[in-house]
A protein has these predicted regions:
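A general, composition-driven signal for non-globular sequence regions
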Residues: 1, 17, 29, 152, ...
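N-terminal capping/linker segments that flank leucine-rich repeat
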Residues: 1-139, 312-406
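Hydrophobic anchor residues at the C-terminal helix/turn of individual leucine-rich repeat
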Residues: 4, 110-111, 120-121, 131-136, ...
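Generic preference for well-ordered alpha-helical elements
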Residues: 7-11, 21-31, 139, 165, ...
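Canonical leucine-rich repeat
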Residues: 92-93, 106, 117, 129, ...
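Core hydrophobic positions of leucine-rich repeats
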Residues: 116-123, 140-150, 166-176, 192-201, ...
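Canonical position 11/12 of the leucine-rich repeat
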Residues: 125-128, 138-139, 150-154, 162, ...
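Positively charged, low-complexity intrinsically disordered regions
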Residues: 200, 232, 258, 292, ...
Length: 406
């Protein structure tokens, strides 16, 4: 008999329908790929897994579960387990939610007690996700929710209520196969962190976020970085009065041709490094409304904006003295000449030959195996002596040596 804790309806249902004297269930810890075996007897539904079970439909087996999974998310996402039926006592070597085994479709139902959906599908190799029967208002954290879902191409989140969400950082990060994303239902008035929100969505062709309320956002680092297929972004309704971090905001948006930043307020921003780096298709940019008096880092801000010939900057465009290396590195000569005529600036901001090596990396909060919060790098940027930039993705956050060039 298992530890006596309050009964769970789902387990009660299972136990009452056990035909054999006892049954071995395989429980997979959802986001850690760990396996546990649990022995249940008839009417034995009082156990330590109360409200930490992700259920599947009764009768589903290994043969069909990969095509259509139904999961029930309970109170604490970090301790959820997935029930897997197995009549014999052989060990199941792999979790079917691992990166290298695709799942066709997942339907999700979320319990009322849930407060956080952080890292819910982290690195889950799934193609389709649908949320059903869900309109809870008390979710506060959706960070890393779909991060690293490289195979995901169909995502229905129209039932998600984001009314009280405060954290959306890395929510869709590295969803490389997503071409369309409908988030017109999102309410974001309470969101504080949007850093790396769409980072690495390299297949995304259109993105309508005209409904976004960004009044309380403080961090927009890398929000659209590596969205290499996006051709235009209308951010004219964005309120950025509280934002302090705009590092790499549009970095590596190679296809971006139109960018409306007319409503951007940057009085509180302290870091603009790499902000437009490698926006190679951008020809016109108006940042005449920018205020940079608090900015302490502008390194490589317009690096490799090779097509940019028309840049409107404010009359009082203050460039920080200490971290201004390569602001206009590898920009077209026409733009460089215009900037030189308008302002008396240090030549290092135009320098195409960068001395030495430096390492920058985006960092985001994640939970390690012990459930403790820690900071880990997701991306590592290597700047060479000749203005060449290689950006690497960290394949395995447990082993920082495993890198893949992007």
């Amino acid at each position: 008999m298992l530890e006596n804790i309050r009964s769970d309806f789902f387990l009660k249902f299972l136990c009452q329908h056990i035909k054999d004297k006892d049954k071995i269930l395989r429980l997979f810890q959802y986001n850690k790929c760990l396996q546990k075996k649990v022995k249940l007897s008839i009417n034995d539904y009082r156990n330590k897994y109360y409200q930490t079970i992700i259920g599947i439909k009764p009768g589903e087996t290994k043969s069909n579960i990969r095509e259509n999974v139904f999961i029930r998310i309970s109170r604490n996402c970090y301790n959820n387990y997935h029930i897997y039926f197995n009549d014999d006592k052989t060990e199941i070597k792999r979790n079917y939610l691992e990166h290298n085994e695709k799942i066709g479709k997942i339907k999700v139902f979320i319990d009322y007690q849930v407060k956080s959906l952080k890292a819910l599908f982290l690195y889950c190799n799934v193609e389709k996700i649908y949320f059903i029967k869900y309109n809870r208002k008390d979710i506060t954290d959706m960070s890393l929710m779909f991060y690293g879902c490289h195979s995901l191409f169909n995502l229905d989140i129209s039932k998600l209520n984001t009314e009280n969400v405060r954290y959306m950082n890395l929510m869709f990060g590295n969803c490389k196969c997503l071409k369309n994303l409908n988030i017109s239902n999102f309410r974001t008035e309470k969101v504080e962190k949007m850093n790396l929100l769409f980072q690495g969505c390299s297949s995304l062709e259109k993105l309508d976020i005209s409904n976004f309320n960004t009044n309380n956002v403080t961090n927009m680092m890398g929000m659209f970085s590596f969205c290499s297929n996006l051709k235009k972004l209308d951010l004219s309704k964005f309120k950025t009065n509280k934002v302090t971090n705009m590092v790499g905001l549009f970095e590596n948006c190679y296809s971006l041709q139109k960018l409306n930043l007319s409503n951007f307020k940057t009085e509180e921003v302290t870091n603009m490094s790499y902000m437009f780096s490698f926006c190679t298709s951008l020809k016109f940019l108006d940042i005449s409304n920018f205020r940079t008096n608090k900015v302490t880092n502008m390194k490589y801000m317009f690096n490799h904006c090779e097509s940019l010939v028309n840049l409107k900057i404010p009359k009082k465009f203050e460039i920080c003295k200490d971290n201004s290396l390569g602001i206009f590195t590898n920009c077209c000569e026409e733009l460089k000449e215009k900037i030189k005529k308008e302002k008396n600036l240090d030549e290092k901001i135009f320098d195409d030959r960068l001395c030495g090596f430096s390492f920058d990396h985006y960092r985001s909060e994640l939970f390690n195996d012990e459930g403790k919060s820690e900071y880990i790098p997701f991306f590592l940027r290597l700047n060479s002596c000749y203005g060449a930039f290689n950006t690497y993705e960290l394949i395995n956050w447990k082993d920082p040596t495993k890198l893949k060039i992007l």
